[in-house]
Swiss-Prot record:
HAMAP family assigned: ATP_synth_b_bprime, ATP_synth_bprime
Subcellular location per the Swiss-Prot or TrEMBL entry: Plastid, Chloroplast thylakoid membrane
Main location: plastid
Protein species of origin: Cyanidium caldarium (Red alga)
Annotated transmembrane regions: 26-43
Keywords: ATP synthesis, ATP-binding, CF(0), Chloroplast, Hydrogen ion transport, Ion transport, Membrane, Nucleotide-binding, Plastid, Thylakoid, Transmembrane, Transmembrane helix, Transport
Statement: the UniProt record of this protein carries the keyword RNA-binding: no
Function: F(1)F(0) ATP synthase produces ATP from ADP in the presence of a proton or sodium gradient. F-type ATPases consist of two structural domains, F(1) containing the extramembraneous catalytic core and F(0) containing the membrane proton channel, linked together by a central stalk and a peripheral stalk. During catalysis, ATP synthesis in the catalytic domain of F(1) is coupled via a rotary mechanism of the central stalk subunits to proton translocation.
MF-aspect GO terms: ATP binding; proton-transporting ATP synthase activity, rotational mechanism; proton-transporting ATPase activity, rotational mechanism
PANTHER family assigned: ATP SYNTHASE SUBUNIT B', CHLOROPLASTIC (PTHR33445:SF2)
Family to which this protein belongs: Belongs to the ATPase B chain family.
Signal peptide extent: none
Note: In plastids the F-type ATPase is also known as CF(1)CF(0).
Protein name: ATP synthase subunit b', chloroplastic
Length: 157
């Protein structure tokens, strides 16, 4: 039987490239079957993992974008509040500075007025005492001159 098969195979002409026998469709079906098995067992799970990962990345990116926008809005609000607070603080400082300067000027004016008044009273008092002293001195001078005159006129007494 082996001889017959060998004779049959050796007597048959090969068709070369265009020799189609049952092996070509069998190999093609095996290839397709392997591709189907690989697709089901490896590629679909890997594709699912890749899609899940892509969705996760997109969600995370979207969440990060929203957080970034909220952060920018919050930062802008805080900057406005800080700027407003700085303006209010500066206005308060200016107001207090103006009030303090006004108070200092008023105190200075009051002090100058009281000093002038004190000096004026002191000068008036000094003039009054001067006049009084001059009167007393004049009276004493008159008395003394009267005594001298009397002694000169009446040397015996």
């Amino acid at each position: 039987m082996q001889d017959i098969l060998n004779i049959y195979l050796s007597s048959e002409e090969s068709g070369g490239l265009f020799d189609f026998d049952a092996t070509l469709p069998l190999m093609a079906s095996q290839f397709l079957l392997i591709m189907l098995i690989l697709d089901i067992t490896f590629y679909k799970p890997i594709n699912k993992v890749l899609k899940d990962r892509e969705n996760y990345i997109l969600k995370t990116l979207e969440s990060a974008t929203q957080i970034s926008e909220k952060t920018k809005e919050t930062l802008a609000r805080y900057e406005e509040v800080i700027l407003k607070s700085k303006k209010e603080s500066q206005q308060l400082i200016d107001s207090i500075k103006t009030k303090t300067e006004h108070d200092i000027v008023n105190e200075l004016i009051q002090t100058q007025n009281s000093t002038r008044e004190f000096i004026s009273k002191s000068i008036k008092e000094l003039y009054r005492k001067k006049e009084q002293t001059l009167k007393v001195l004049e009276e004493d001078t008159e008395n003394l001159s009267d005594k001298i005159y009397l002694k000169l006129i009446n040397p015996k007494q």
